[in-house]
Amino acid sequence: MYSKNWQQYLSTLKTDFTKLAKLEFLQPNGSVAFALDNQVTNKRSKAFIQDGDITVNLQNGSRRQVNIALANLDGAYDYALNKIWFGQQIRLSEGLILPDGTDFYIPQGVFLVENPEEAFEPGLRQASYQLTDKWAAIDGTLGGNLEGAYGVNAGTNIFAAIASLLRLNRFDMSGTAGAPIDAVAPLFTSYYNDKTQTLTDGSSVSLITAPYDYLSSETGNIGEVILGLAEMLAAWVGYNPTGRLEVDPSQDDILDTSKPVLWDFSMGKQLMGIRYASKPAEVYNDVIVVGATNNESLTARGRAQNRDISSDTCISRIGLKTKRLSMKDYYSDEMCQAYAEWQLKRYAVLGKTVTLTTTQMFHIVENQIITIRREDKPGAPVERHLVQGFTRPIGQTGTMTINAVSVNDFPIATAVLDDGIASDKYIVSGNTLYIPASVGASVSNGTLTIPGSVENGILTLTNP
Protein backbone atom coordinates (compact mmCIF):
# COMPACT_ATOMS: atom_id res chain seq x y z
CA MET A 1 0.00 0.00 0.00
CA TYR A 2 2.86 2.41 0.81
CA SER A 3 5.48 0.63 -1.37
CA LYS A 4 9.04 1.77 -0.60
CA ASN A 5 8.05 4.19 2.16
CA TRP A 6 6.02 1.44 3.86
CA GLN A 7 9.04 -0.87 3.97
CA GLN A 8 11.18 1.96 5.34
CA TYR A 9 8.54 2.63 7.98
CA LEU A 10 8.56 -1.01 9.13
CA SER A 11 12.36 -1.00 9.32
CA THR A 12 12.46 2.31 11.20
CA LEU A 13 10.13 0.92 13.89
CA LYS A 14 13.05 -1.27 14.99
CA THR A 15 15.23 1.79 15.68
CA ASP A 16 15.12 4.79 18.01
CA PHE A 17 12.88 6.81 15.72
CA THR A 18 11.47 10.32 16.02
CA LYS A 19 7.72 10.21 16.63
CA LEU A 20 5.32 12.39 14.65
CA ALA A 21 1.76 13.34 15.56
CA LYS A 22 -0.57 15.65 13.70
CA LEU A 23 -4.06 17.05 14.20
CA GLU A 24 -5.88 18.20 11.07
CA PHE A 25 -8.91 20.42 11.62
CA LEU A 26 -11.39 19.56 8.88
CA GLN A 27 -13.97 21.49 6.93
CA PRO A 28 -17.52 20.02 6.81
CA ASN A 29 -16.69 18.41 3.43
CA GLY A 30 -13.67 16.62 4.89
CA SER A 31 -10.96 18.87 3.46
CA VAL A 32 -8.23 20.21 5.76
CA ALA A 33 -8.68 23.74 7.12
CA PHE A 34 -5.41 23.82 9.10
CA ALA A 35 -3.12 21.45 10.99
CA LEU A 36 -1.17 21.26 14.23
CA ASP A 37 1.66 18.85 15.03
CA ASN A 38 3.94 17.86 17.91
CA GLN A 39 6.81 20.06 16.75
CA VAL A 40 7.53 23.24 18.72
CA THR A 41 8.61 24.91 15.45
CA ASN A 42 5.14 24.69 13.88
CA LYS A 43 5.05 26.94 10.80
CA ARG A 44 1.49 28.15 11.36
CA SER A 45 1.82 29.16 15.01
CA LYS A 46 3.81 28.46 18.16
CA ALA A 47 1.15 26.04 19.41
CA PHE A 48 1.93 22.32 19.45
CA ILE A 49 0.66 18.95 20.69
CA GLN A 50 2.03 18.49 24.18
CA ASP A 51 0.66 15.18 25.37
CA GLY A 52 -2.21 12.71 25.08
CA ASP A 53 -3.24 9.16 24.28
CA ILE A 54 -5.47 7.18 21.93
CA THR A 55 -7.59 4.18 22.95
CA VAL A 56 -9.25 1.78 20.48
CA ASN A 57 -11.62 -1.12 21.22
CA LEU A 58 -13.19 -3.54 18.75
CA GLN A 59 -16.97 -3.25 19.03
CA ASN A 60 -19.99 -2.19 17.01
CA GLY A 61 -20.50 1.55 17.25
CA SER A 62 -17.98 3.86 18.91
CA ARG A 63 -14.43 2.44 18.86
CA ARG A 64 -11.95 5.30 19.21
CA GLN A 65 -11.23 7.83 21.95
CA VAL A 66 -8.46 10.44 22.22
CA ASN A 67 -7.34 12.66 25.09
CA ILE A 68 -4.96 15.37 23.99
CA ALA A 69 -3.29 18.49 25.42
CA LEU A 70 -2.30 21.46 23.28
CA ALA A 71 0.30 23.91 24.60
CA ASN A 72 1.49 27.47 23.88
CA LEU A 73 -1.85 28.29 22.30
CA ASP A 74 -2.86 31.40 20.47
CA GLY A 75 -6.41 32.59 19.90
CA ALA A 76 -6.87 30.45 16.78
CA TYR A 77 -7.31 27.33 18.90
CA ASP A 78 -9.90 28.66 21.36
CA TYR A 79 -13.07 26.64 21.77
CA ALA A 80 -15.34 29.35 20.40
CA LEU A 81 -17.59 30.13 17.46
CA ASN A 82 -15.70 30.48 14.14
CA LYS A 83 -12.68 28.78 15.68
CA ILE A 84 -12.82 25.25 17.18
CA TRP A 85 -16.51 24.77 17.77
CA PHE A 86 -19.29 22.26 18.36
CA GLY A 87 -19.16 19.53 15.70
CA GLN A 88 -15.59 20.31 14.62
CA GLN A 89 -14.04 17.22 13.03
CA ILE A 90 -10.39 16.57 13.81
CA ARG A 91 -8.25 13.89 12.17
CA LEU A 92 -5.38 12.40 14.16
CA SER A 93 -2.40 10.95 12.31
CA GLU A 94 0.71 9.43 13.84
CA GLY A 95 3.96 8.28 12.34
CA LEU A 96 7.70 8.84 12.25
CA ILE A 97 10.54 10.40 10.30
CA LEU A 98 11.98 7.99 7.72
CA PRO A 99 15.77 7.63 7.27
CA ASP A 100 15.65 9.91 4.20
CA GLY A 101 14.01 12.67 6.26
CA THR A 102 10.48 12.12 4.94
CA ASP A 103 7.57 12.58 7.32
CA PHE A 104 5.49 9.37 7.28
CA TYR A 105 1.98 9.53 8.74
CA ILE A 106 -0.75 6.90 9.22
CA PRO A 107 -4.33 8.07 9.97
CA GLN A 108 -5.71 6.96 13.33
CA GLY A 109 -9.27 8.24 13.11
CA VAL A 110 -11.56 11.22 12.69
CA PHE A 111 -12.92 12.62 15.94
CA LEU A 112 -15.25 15.25 17.37
CA VAL A 113 -14.51 17.58 20.28
CA GLU A 114 -16.57 16.40 23.26
CA ASN A 115 -15.28 17.90 26.52
CA PRO A 116 -12.85 20.80 25.99
CA GLU A 117 -10.98 22.35 28.93
CA GLU A 118 -8.91 25.51 28.71
CA ALA A 119 -6.31 26.67 31.26
CA PHE A 120 -4.79 30.14 31.55
CA GLU A 121 -1.85 30.84 33.90
CA PRO A 122 1.04 33.32 33.82
CA GLY A 123 3.21 32.26 30.90
CA LEU A 124 0.97 29.30 30.13
CA ARG A 125 -1.98 28.84 27.85
CA GLN A 126 -3.11 25.32 27.07
CA ALA A 127 -6.22 23.29 26.29
CA SER A 128 -7.20 19.69 26.92
CA TYR A 129 -9.56 18.09 24.44
CA GLN A 130 -11.45 14.85 24.84
CA LEU A 131 -12.00 13.70 21.28
CA THR A 132 -14.67 11.10 20.69
CA ASP A 133 -15.24 8.71 17.81
CA LYS A 134 -17.04 10.10 14.76
CA TRP A 135 -19.87 7.76 15.76
CA ALA A 136 -20.85 10.41 18.34
CA ALA A 137 -22.30 12.48 15.49
CA ILE A 138 -24.96 9.83 14.87
CA ASP A 139 -25.65 8.16 18.24
CA GLY A 140 -27.16 11.17 20.02
CA THR A 141 -23.99 12.17 21.88
CA LEU A 142 -23.22 15.15 19.66
CA GLY A 143 -25.94 14.71 17.05
CA GLY A 144 -28.02 12.19 15.17
CA ASN A 145 -31.21 12.18 17.26
CA LEU A 146 -34.31 11.46 15.19
CA GLU A 147 -37.55 13.41 15.41
CA GLY A 148 -39.51 10.21 15.99
CA ALA A 149 -39.57 6.51 15.20
CA TYR A 150 -37.67 5.67 12.00
CA GLY A 151 -38.72 2.72 9.87
CA VAL A 152 -37.06 0.57 7.22
CA ASN A 153 -39.40 -1.68 5.25
CA ALA A 154 -38.74 -5.34 4.53
CA GLY A 155 -37.11 -5.76 1.12
CA THR A 156 -35.13 -2.51 1.39
CA ASN A 157 -31.46 -2.69 0.41
CA ILE A 158 -29.67 -2.54 3.77
CA PHE A 159 -26.58 -0.77 2.44
CA ALA A 160 -28.68 1.84 0.61
CA ALA A 161 -30.65 2.46 3.82
CA ILE A 162 -27.44 3.07 5.80
CA ALA A 163 -26.04 5.39 3.13
CA SER A 164 -29.27 7.41 3.00
CA LEU A 165 -29.18 7.90 6.78
CA LEU A 166 -25.71 9.42 6.58
CA ARG A 167 -26.88 11.75 3.80
CA LEU A 168 -29.62 13.30 5.97
CA ASN A 169 -29.24 17.06 6.37
CA ARG A 170 -27.64 17.70 9.76
CA PHE A 171 -29.59 20.94 10.23
CA ASP A 172 -33.15 19.67 9.75
CA MET A 173 -32.74 15.84 9.40
CA SER A 174 -34.36 15.99 5.96
CA GLY A 175 -33.20 14.36 2.77
CA THR A 176 -32.31 17.69 1.18
CA ALA A 177 -28.77 18.05 -0.10
CA GLY A 178 -26.19 20.52 1.14
CA ALA A 179 -25.10 19.58 4.65
CA PRO A 180 -25.00 15.79 5.11
CA ILE A 181 -24.40 14.30 8.53
CA ASP A 182 -21.41 12.50 7.04
CA ALA A 183 -19.97 13.73 3.74
CA VAL A 184 -17.76 10.64 3.41
CA ALA A 185 -19.44 7.73 1.62
CA PRO A 186 -19.57 4.53 3.73
CA LEU A 187 -17.55 1.46 2.77
CA PHE A 188 -19.57 -1.73 2.34
CA THR A 189 -18.27 -5.27 2.09
CA SER A 190 -19.04 -7.30 -1.05
CA TYR A 191 -19.25 -10.49 1.02
CA TYR A 192 -23.07 -10.56 1.13
CA ASN A 193 -23.79 -9.51 -2.45
CA ASP A 194 -24.28 -12.98 -3.96
CA LYS A 195 -25.68 -14.69 -0.86
CA THR A 196 -29.29 -15.49 0.02
CA GLN A 197 -31.13 -16.74 3.07
CA THR A 198 -34.27 -18.84 3.39
CA LEU A 199 -36.86 -17.35 5.72
CA THR A 200 -39.09 -19.39 8.00
CA ASP A 201 -41.96 -19.02 5.50
CA GLY A 202 -39.84 -20.79 2.87
CA SER A 203 -39.08 -17.72 0.76
CA SER A 204 -35.54 -16.94 -0.34
CA VAL A 205 -34.20 -13.38 -0.15
CA SER A 206 -30.88 -11.66 -0.74
CA LEU A 207 -28.80 -11.16 2.39
CA ILE A 208 -28.43 -7.46 1.64
CA THR A 209 -32.19 -6.83 1.70
CA ALA A 210 -34.01 -6.30 4.99
CA PRO A 211 -35.81 -9.57 5.85
CA TYR A 212 -38.33 -7.80 8.08
CA ASP A 213 -39.72 -4.35 8.89
CA TYR A 214 -37.50 -2.36 11.24
CA LEU A 215 -38.82 0.42 13.49
CA SER A 216 -36.62 2.38 15.87
CA SER A 217 -37.76 3.67 19.24
CA GLU A 218 -39.55 7.02 19.48
CA THR A 219 -36.44 8.54 21.02
CA GLY A 220 -34.03 6.76 18.69
CA ASN A 221 -31.04 8.01 16.75
CA ILE A 222 -29.26 7.25 13.50
CA GLY A 223 -26.66 5.09 15.23
CA GLU A 224 -29.40 2.92 16.73
CA VAL A 225 -30.94 2.37 13.27
CA ILE A 226 -27.58 1.51 11.70
CA LEU A 227 -26.87 -1.00 14.48
CA GLY A 228 -30.30 -2.53 13.86
CA LEU A 229 -29.59 -2.85 10.14
CA ALA A 230 -26.13 -4.33 10.80
CA GLU A 231 -27.76 -6.86 13.12
CA MET A 232 -29.79 -8.12 10.16
CA LEU A 233 -26.47 -9.14 8.60
CA ALA A 234 -24.70 -10.13 11.83
CA ALA A 235 -22.03 -7.67 10.65
CA TRP A 236 -19.35 -5.48 12.19
CA VAL A 237 -20.01 -1.74 11.83
CA GLY A 238 -17.97 1.26 12.94
CA TYR A 239 -15.68 4.02 11.73
CA ASN A 240 -12.26 2.94 10.45
CA PRO A 241 -8.97 4.85 10.96
CA THR A 242 -9.62 7.00 7.87
CA GLY A 243 -12.92 8.24 9.30
CA ARG A 244 -15.12 6.21 6.98
CA LEU A 245 -18.08 4.17 8.22
CA GLU A 246 -17.31 0.55 7.37
CA VAL A 247 -19.50 -2.55 7.37
CA ASP A 248 -17.57 -5.85 7.54
CA PRO A 249 -18.92 -9.41 7.65
CA SER A 250 -18.58 -11.29 10.91
CA GLN A 251 -19.05 -14.56 9.03
CA ASP A 252 -15.64 -14.53 7.32
CA ASP A 253 -14.14 -13.31 10.60
CA ILE A 254 -14.43 -16.86 11.94
CA LEU A 255 -11.18 -18.13 10.38
CA ASP A 256 -8.73 -15.49 11.59
CA THR A 257 -5.79 -17.79 10.90
CA SER A 258 -5.90 -16.64 7.25
CA LYS A 259 -5.43 -12.92 7.99
CA PRO A 260 -2.08 -11.20 7.27
CA VAL A 261 0.24 -10.50 10.20
CA LEU A 262 0.76 -6.86 11.24
CA TRP A 263 3.89 -7.56 13.32
CA ASP A 264 5.93 -10.52 14.50
CA PHE A 265 6.92 -9.73 18.10
CA SER A 266 9.93 -11.20 19.91
CA MET A 267 10.65 -10.70 23.59
CA GLY A 268 13.36 -8.15 24.31
CA LYS A 269 12.98 -6.33 20.99
CA GLN A 270 9.77 -4.39 20.38
CA LEU A 271 7.99 -6.58 22.94
CA MET A 272 8.64 -5.60 26.56
CA GLY A 273 6.18 -7.79 28.41
CA ILE A 274 3.22 -10.17 28.14
CA ARG A 275 0.41 -10.82 30.60
CA TYR A 276 -2.03 -13.70 30.22
CA ALA A 277 -5.39 -13.75 32.01
CA SER A 278 -7.96 -16.54 32.24
CA LYS A 279 -11.66 -16.20 33.13
CA PRO A 280 -13.17 -19.68 32.87
CA ALA A 281 -16.57 -18.48 34.12
CA GLU A 282 -16.99 -16.50 30.87
CA VAL A 283 -16.33 -19.46 28.56
CA TYR A 284 -19.08 -21.31 26.65
CA ASN A 285 -18.65 -24.17 24.19
CA ASP A 286 -22.26 -24.55 23.06
CA VAL A 287 -24.22 -21.63 21.60
CA ILE A 288 -27.90 -21.81 20.67
CA VAL A 289 -29.49 -18.95 18.74
CA VAL A 290 -33.29 -18.78 18.61
CA GLY A 291 -34.74 -16.43 16.02
CA ALA A 292 -38.21 -15.31 15.02
CA THR A 293 -41.30 -17.51 14.78
CA ASN A 294 -43.55 -17.21 11.73
CA ASN A 295 -47.34 -17.59 11.50
CA GLU A 296 -46.97 -21.36 11.08
CA SER A 297 -45.08 -21.63 14.38
CA LEU A 298 -41.78 -22.38 12.64
CA THR A 299 -38.83 -20.83 14.48
CA ALA A 300 -35.49 -19.91 12.93
CA ARG A 301 -32.66 -21.63 14.81
CA GLY A 302 -28.93 -22.10 14.80
CA ARG A 303 -26.54 -23.99 17.05
CA ALA A 304 -22.78 -24.37 17.17
CA GLN A 305 -20.58 -26.42 19.49
CA ASN A 306 -16.89 -26.61 20.22
CA ARG A 307 -16.01 -30.26 19.60
CA ASP A 308 -12.50 -29.40 18.46
CA ILE A 309 -10.25 -31.65 20.56
CA SER A 310 -7.30 -29.30 19.99
CA SER A 311 -9.18 -26.58 21.91
CA ASP A 312 -8.70 -26.23 25.66
CA THR A 313 -12.39 -25.42 26.07
CA CYS A 314 -13.95 -28.15 23.91
CA ILE A 315 -16.87 -30.18 25.27
CA SER A 316 -14.81 -33.34 25.76
CA ARG A 317 -12.38 -31.45 28.05
CA ILE A 318 -14.58 -29.24 30.24
CA GLY A 319 -18.06 -30.60 29.63
CA LEU A 320 -21.01 -28.85 28.02
CA LYS A 321 -21.40 -25.13 28.82
CA THR A 322 -24.39 -23.75 26.96
CA LYS A 323 -25.27 -20.16 26.12
CA ARG A 324 -28.74 -19.54 24.69
CA LEU A 325 -29.29 -16.31 22.78
CA SER A 326 -32.59 -14.87 21.60
CA MET A 327 -32.46 -12.92 18.33
CA LYS A 328 -36.12 -12.11 17.75
CA ASP A 329 -35.42 -10.37 14.44
CA TYR A 330 -33.52 -13.25 12.79
CA TYR A 331 -35.92 -14.90 10.34
CA SER A 332 -33.66 -17.53 8.75
CA ASP A 333 -31.75 -20.59 9.94
CA GLU A 334 -28.72 -19.42 7.94
CA MET A 335 -28.48 -16.15 9.84
CA CYS A 336 -29.02 -17.84 13.21
CA GLN A 337 -26.35 -20.42 12.38
CA ALA A 338 -23.82 -17.80 11.24
CA TYR A 339 -24.42 -15.82 14.42
CA ALA A 340 -24.11 -18.94 16.60
CA GLU A 341 -20.74 -19.85 15.06
CA TRP A 342 -19.47 -16.28 15.42
CA GLN A 343 -20.54 -16.06 19.07
CA LEU A 344 -19.07 -19.50 19.81
CA LYS A 345 -15.72 -18.21 18.65
CA ARG A 346 -16.01 -15.19 20.96
CA TYR A 347 -17.15 -17.16 24.00
CA ALA A 348 -14.40 -19.73 23.50
CA VAL A 349 -11.68 -17.09 23.86
CA LEU A 350 -13.24 -14.68 26.36
CA GLY A 351 -11.66 -16.62 29.18
CA LYS A 352 -8.12 -16.28 27.85
CA THR A 353 -6.76 -12.86 26.92
CA VAL A 354 -3.26 -11.51 26.44
CA THR A 355 -1.95 -8.00 27.06
CA LEU A 356 1.28 -6.90 25.37
CA THR A 357 3.49 -3.99 26.36
CA THR A 358 5.37 -2.85 23.25
CA THR A 359 7.17 0.04 21.67
CA GLN A 360 4.92 2.44 19.78
CA MET A 361 3.62 1.24 16.41
CA PHE A 362 1.18 3.15 14.26
CA HIS A 363 -0.16 0.53 11.85
CA ILE A 364 -1.72 -1.68 14.53
CA VAL A 365 -5.45 -2.00 13.79
CA GLU A 366 -8.25 -3.74 15.64
CA ASN A 367 -9.50 -7.11 14.33
CA GLN A 368 -6.14 -7.91 12.70
CA ILE A 369 -3.40 -10.43 13.54
CA ILE A 370 -0.11 -10.11 15.41
CA THR A 371 2.25 -12.94 16.31
CA ILE A 372 4.52 -13.56 19.31
CA ARG A 373 7.65 -15.71 19.18
CA ARG A 374 7.87 -17.37 22.58
CA GLU A 375 11.61 -17.93 22.68
CA ASP A 376 11.29 -18.69 26.40
CA LYS A 377 9.55 -21.98 25.49
CA PRO A 378 11.08 -25.12 23.95
CA GLY A 379 11.04 -24.87 20.17
CA ALA A 380 10.22 -21.12 20.29
CA PRO A 381 6.57 -21.57 19.23
CA VAL A 382 4.78 -18.74 17.42
CA GLU A 383 1.47 -17.60 18.91
CA ARG A 384 -1.12 -15.88 16.72
CA HIS A 385 -3.34 -13.26 18.37
CA LEU A 386 -6.27 -11.18 17.16
CA VAL A 387 -6.06 -7.51 18.20
CA GLN A 388 -9.10 -6.46 20.25
CA GLY A 389 -7.85 -2.97 21.06
CA PHE A 390 -4.91 -0.87 22.16
CA THR A 391 -3.82 2.25 24.04
CA ARG A 392 -0.90 4.36 22.84
CA PRO A 393 0.58 7.67 24.04
CA ILE A 394 0.61 10.47 21.49
CA GLY A 395 3.84 11.90 22.84
CA GLN A 396 7.35 10.86 21.83
CA THR A 397 7.93 8.66 24.85
CA GLY A 398 5.93 5.89 26.48
CA THR A 399 4.95 2.33 25.65
CA MET A 400 1.94 0.94 23.85
CA THR A 401 -0.51 -1.59 25.32
CA ILE A 402 -2.17 -4.10 22.97
CA ASN A 403 -5.10 -6.26 24.07
CA ALA A 404 -5.62 -9.45 22.09
CA VAL A 405 -7.03 -12.97 22.12
CA SER A 406 -5.25 -16.08 20.93
CA VAL A 407 -6.25 -17.27 17.47
CA ASN A 408 -4.90 -20.67 18.49
CA ASP A 409 -7.75 -20.85 21.00
CA PHE A 410 -10.43 -20.27 18.35
CA PRO A 411 -12.19 -23.61 17.92
CA ILE A 412 -13.48 -25.17 14.73
CA ALA A 413 -17.24 -24.76 15.15
CA THR A 414 -19.46 -27.78 14.62
CA ALA A 415 -22.92 -26.92 13.31
CA VAL A 416 -25.54 -28.99 15.12
CA LEU A 417 -29.30 -29.35 15.19
CA ASP A 418 -31.06 -28.15 18.30
CA ASP A 419 -31.03 -31.63 19.84
CA GLY A 420 -27.23 -31.62 19.85
CA ILE A 421 -26.67 -34.06 16.98
CA ALA A 422 -24.02 -32.95 14.52
CA SER A 423 -25.26 -31.87 11.11
CA ASP A 424 -23.34 -34.61 9.32
CA LYS A 425 -26.27 -36.88 10.23
CA TYR A 426 -29.88 -37.05 9.07
CA ILE A 427 -32.40 -36.85 11.89
CA VAL A 428 -35.79 -38.56 11.79
CA SER A 429 -38.26 -36.89 14.15
CA GLY A 430 -41.93 -37.81 13.80
CA ASN A 431 -42.93 -37.08 10.22
CA THR A 432 -39.92 -34.84 9.59
CA LEU A 433 -36.61 -35.86 8.03
CA TYR A 434 -33.82 -33.32 8.61
CA ILE A 435 -31.29 -33.36 5.76
CA PRO A 436 -28.02 -31.39 6.03
CA ALA A 437 -27.74 -28.71 3.38
CA SER A 438 -24.14 -29.65 2.56
CA VAL A 439 -25.20 -33.03 1.13
CA GLY A 440 -27.35 -33.46 -1.98
CA ALA A 441 -30.19 -36.00 -2.03
CA SER A 442 -31.84 -37.30 -5.21
CA VAL A 443 -35.58 -37.72 -5.75
CA SER A 444 -36.96 -39.90 -8.57
CA ASN A 445 -40.58 -40.99 -9.05
CA GLY A 446 -41.44 -40.03 -5.50
CA THR A 447 -38.46 -41.93 -4.05
CA LEU A 448 -35.85 -40.10 -1.96
CA THR A 449 -32.39 -41.65 -2.25
CA ILE A 450 -29.90 -40.93 0.54
CA PRO A 451 -26.44 -42.53 0.90
CA GLY A 452 -25.94 -43.86 4.42
CA SER A 453 -27.08 -46.30 7.07
CA VAL A 454 -29.88 -46.06 9.65
CA GLU A 455 -29.36 -46.88 13.31
CA ASN A 456 -31.74 -45.92 16.13
CA GLY A 457 -33.55 -43.47 13.89
CA ILE A 458 -30.33 -41.73 12.84
CA LEU A 459 -29.16 -41.95 9.24
CA THR A 460 -25.39 -41.50 9.15
CA LEU A 461 -23.99 -40.20 5.86
CA THR A 462 -21.73 -42.50 3.90
CA ASN A 463 -19.73 -39.50 2.63
CA PRO A 464 -20.65 -36.54 4.88
Region spans (language model):
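Assembly/interface hotspot detector across virion components, adhesins/toxins, and nucleic-acid enzymes
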Residues: 24, 95, 192, 196-198, ...
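Surface-exposed cap/loop segments at beta↔alpha junctions
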Residues: 1-20, 56-65, 72-185, 414
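Short beta-strand and beta-hairpin "edge-sheet" elements
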Residues: 48-49, 96-131, 238-239, 370-403
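Charged- and aromatic-enriched interaction segments used to assemble
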Residues: 102-105, 119-279, 435-436, 453-455, ...
